[in-house]
Structure formats: structure tokens, C-alpha cells
Amino acid sequence: MLRHLVVGAVAVLAASAGVGALAPSAGAATTVGISVDAGTSVGTVPSSGVGLNTGVGDENMGTAKVSSLMKAARVRQLRFPGGSGADGYHWKTHTMSDGGWVVPNTDFDHFMATAKKVGAQPILTANYGSGTPQEAADWVKYANVDKGYGVKYWEIGNEVYGNGHYANGKGWETDTHADKSPKEYAKNLVAYAKAMKAVDPKVKIGAVLTTPGGWPDKEKAPGDSADWNNTVLSIAAKSIDFVIVHWYPGGTTTADLLNTPSRIAGVTSELRSLISTYAGSHAASVEIAVTETDATFSPALTSQAAALFAPDTYMTWFEQGATHVDWWNLHNGTDQAPTTVNGQTDYQDGGILSAGTCAGGKCQPPRDTPFPTYWGIRSLTALAQPGDTIVKSSSRNPSVAVHAVRSSNGGLNVMLINKSPQNAAQVSLSYAGFTPAAGAVTTVSYAKGATSLTTAKRGTAGAQTLPPYSITTLQLKPASGTASADKPSPAPTPTAATPVVSASGTTGTRAQAENSAGTPVSQPTPNGTSGGLASTGASSAVTYSALGGLLVIAVGGMLALRGRRRRASHGK
């Protein structure tokens, strides 16, 4: 069965109605002041931070071409076995509990071979929904004792809060437990951790949390004394090593989407506050993992706005202390017809590589063709390597985002993202703690419509012109005769949670935008028989009703349309 992404009606309507702009009208050249303090650290680029989701239905996952593309993008982590399917996946038999779609060359050993070729660390999602602690412990034994793979990170379930506990039993996540409450999940989570660490004490266990600001965060179902996050952490915080959130901020326009990274600081601050409350002396070692993110719930999924969103999102999460960020997805597929977003075809597909899907009489590029989102992620290779120091930087205009990194060779790399679809941006840069060499600088850029990164000598360290809708990374060397900056001093770590304010647009999980019972997300849609989520948001009232082929979810007065569970035929 195909579990594939379907973008909802509100997002599609937003695309057809046009998108917002972050800069003045066409023709105006915006001047933006950028400040970089190379002497103040805001974090370290994590060793396995740049991650990507894979799935058991993706027959091209381990091909030489696909592995080469992932390696070139320096993907450092691969997640397996794939989203909501993980709660139905049985690793020993390479089968789904509901008889769902898998392909022969995507079992665990094949996945590990792919991870090795790419040079990526695996992060595995143990089956909570239809599995047991013993099944998970057996997986640890096979992976780390029998095979010597050394798999370190293990999630316990996918979006377990989507099991129907908050929606009268109508959820998207497989969960065969009679009790679907957060209390029961937490008790079982402790049991999973105990069983798995008995086999290999070095494994790290992750707890599924709701994302602050997104449904069902802060909800309490009948009989609950607290919401999901407080309940789970109050019971299990001392048994876990990392917490898991999924980040799908969306937006009704591309401008909304590109503004959402500004909300990440509030999300991480709230998570840190929760961890500190419940984990005690263990709190400082509990990591934050964002194991799914992309531009779902916005007009752009494959076009340039999504490409700009990708590196901005990765780097902002790293600046806030996240140690893993995994994009959804390697291949995805869709039954949605392509749209036009800012003059560019958007294939409405969450994959970074084309799945070769045809819909609405139009076909994607040949399978494995990189979408702009791939190049957005690959742009990070020009900015940072694992272990590099992220330093403080700021922009005086939200139309240009900035991220800066002190490289291991003593240089300074500065990524500039022009979010205006129409206007070039004149940028004036100032530096503290680093004196850049004079003359033209090496830049690595990705512009709208490009099919590769471009390296050139352009502008100076103090002045650059950024094309519309572009990513430009300056690779600066210290001035001759000057020492590179001293080791950057650490920035203060926030201790109090700041309010999480939802941006206009939508918020939710990827699974809420999928056909809830098809074959895996990576498999192309054969017959276009699925619905999609139009809009959802944090609220207390959730009701369900049937409307034709759709499940209508009323969330506090907002409508969400979700494809009803159905079985589909398969085709290539």
C-alpha cells in the first residue's frame, strides 16, 4: 500500500491565488545590513546533523546514482524505516503489519549498506504501534551485537500522539495498544529503553513529543491529568537520551513559509524547559532531534522557496542546539497535479529527488532528477562541516537570512539567503572577531532555475549583490598578516521558555497530509485515489465526519481534509 504525500486544498488554493513577497516591488534593490561576530559561538555543527528520511517502499534508495547524490550533498544521517510505516514495520520479516507495501531490496541490511555507501549514520524507528520491547531489543542485538553496525540512535515509535487518543479514536498512526494515552506510551517507553539498553548500554533512546505550537500540543483528552509532553516526560525523562519533534510549519504563502525559521527559537526553548523540569541532572545531556521536516502545508514543496527554506531551517535548528534534522524525504511521490509558484513549476512532492510521478496530465522529470530542495540542502556543503563552530550573525532585514560558521582551517563562511522572489538585494557586511582578506571572494551560489551549485569570484567580503530567490555562501580567508579570530566564546543558553506564536498558515504533521493507508511514501501513486489535509491548527475541539472520499476533521473551527484509509493497486 502506498503512503504518499498529498497536499491539501488550502495550500493548493494559496498557490493558485499567488504568493506573498518579503521585499519591495520588482525593480527595487534592497540594501540589507549584515553583522557577523566571529568571536561569539552559538553552537557546533553536529556530526550527523544533516539528515534525510528513507522508506521501505523506495526501490531506488540504494542505487549507485542515488547514493552518489546523497554523498555529494554530505547527508550525514539516514532515517529508517520511514515515517508512519515504522509503527507497522517488522524488521525480522521485512513486512508491514497491515500487509502494506515493501520492496525486497529495502530491508534493514540493504538500508545499512546504503548508509555505509553514503557515509551516513543510521537513526532507526522501533515499532511501537504494533511491536513490542522484545522485538526492538532483538533488533538492537542483531544490529549491534550480531552484525556490528553500531546503530546509536533509536526512536520509539513515530508520531504516536496521532494514534487517535486526541480525536475519538480517529488517527493516522498505527497503535494496537488498548490504552493509547500518553501515560501508557511513557510506561511502555521505559520498558523499551530498559530492554534495548540491556542488550547494548550505548544505544540512545528517543521519546516522541508533540511539537510546541502544533496540534495536539497542550491538548488533554478525557481522563488525562496533563498534556502529552508533560505526561511522557514526567514518567520517562530519566530513561531517555533525546526527544523527537517533527517540524512542518507551512504557510499560506511562500513568504509565510520563509519566515517560519524565526519560530524555532521559541520551540527549542520550550522543549529545553520541559527537559529541565523532568530530567534533573540528566537534562543537559538530553538531545533534541527533528526527525522530519519539509515545506508541507505551504504552496511550495519542490520549487525555489522550499529550496531556500531547507538550509535556513537546518542551520536555525543547529543554532538552537538540535543535533539531528532529517528532511522528508529522499523519494516521495504524489498524486497532485503540478502547480506554478513564482513562475516555477512545483511538483507538489516532498522528495528531494523526483519519483517520476505523473498527475493531472503532467509528469515529473525522470526519476532521481534532483529537485531544487536537493540543491538547497547541498548548499550547506559550502557553509559547514561537522565540528565547525557556528558563530553569531544577524540581518537588519528579514528578507535576507544569514548564517555564519568558523571553518576548521581558520576561515569564515557566511551563507546569505535572499527571500525575495523578484528583487536583488544589495548587502553590506560588517565583521567582529575576524578580518577578511581584501579583494574578490569565493562564492558558492544556487539561484532559481539552476541545476547545480555555481562557484565564482564575486564581490567583496563587505559588499555583495544577491540575485532574487538565491542562496549565496561567501568563503572568506583572514587578511594577510592577521591572526584568525580567537576561539569563539559561547553564547548564553536560554533557560526560560518563550511563547510559541503560530504564524499565519497551517501547522501539522506530515502524516496528516498523507493518504493514511497507501503504500510507502516513496512509491508513485498509481491511480490518484487519495485526499489531502487542507488546514489544521492547535485547538481543543476535534471532530470527524465523512464527506465523499474525504475525512473532514474540524479542529477548533478550522477544517482539515484527510484522505480516508483505503487500499490501492500498485504500479511502477
Residue ranges and their predicted role:
Residues 181-316, 320:
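Noncatalytic carbohydrate-binding groove/subsite architecture in carbohydrate-active enzymes
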Residues 546-572:
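C-terminal membrane-anchoring or membrane-association module
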Residues 454-486:
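C-terminal beta-strand-rich structural cap/linker in extracellular carbohydrate-active enzymes
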Residues 503, 509-548:
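Extracellular Ser/Thr-rich, low-complexity/disordered mucin-like segments
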Residues 295-378, 388-401:
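Aromatic/acidic polysaccharide-binding cleft in carbohydrate-active enzymes
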Residues 29-238:
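N-terminal catalytic cores of secreted or lumenal carbohydrate-active enzymes
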Residues 15-25:
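C-terminal segment of classical bacterial N-terminal signal peptides
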